[in-house]
Amino acid sequence: MQSVASDTAPLEPHHTHFVLVPGKAWGDEAPWIARVANELSYKAPSVTILINGGKIAWLDVTSSVKARRPVVVLAGSGRTADTLAAMLRSGQPVNDSTATLTTSGFLHAIDLEQGFDAIAQLLRDRLTTISSAPSKAG
């Protein structure tokens, strides 16, 4: 039997594809996720959905905003999503980096209590807005 290093994890056998990125720390993958999403979506509109989230979620949201991808924040799902939704609604960022996020125009909060139909409509609206925007190429 082959020995396995203690700092490894098995790959999920039901997944068909894996994207391996450089880095040694949690969060190093955040900018790569945004880049891969851009490549996979090609010219189709895409959004990032923030549900709950911890420390790394801030990096994921920042990377999505830098990639000019809208982020739908599900308020009521906990932790980072609730903090970010509260900042969006109050206009009171915690610091300079959150001020950049909340004033970017790419973040949109919706309460989970509004239900599936309202969330689905917001996603459709964000995707329609993206697809009708002029392309960067001209």
Residue ranges and their predicted role:
Residues M1-A120:
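Acidic/glycine-enriched connector segments
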Residues Q114, A120-D125, T129-A133:
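Ser/Thr/Pro-rich, acidic low-complexity intrinsically disordered regulatory segments
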Residues P134-G138:
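Long, low-complexity, intrinsically disordered segments
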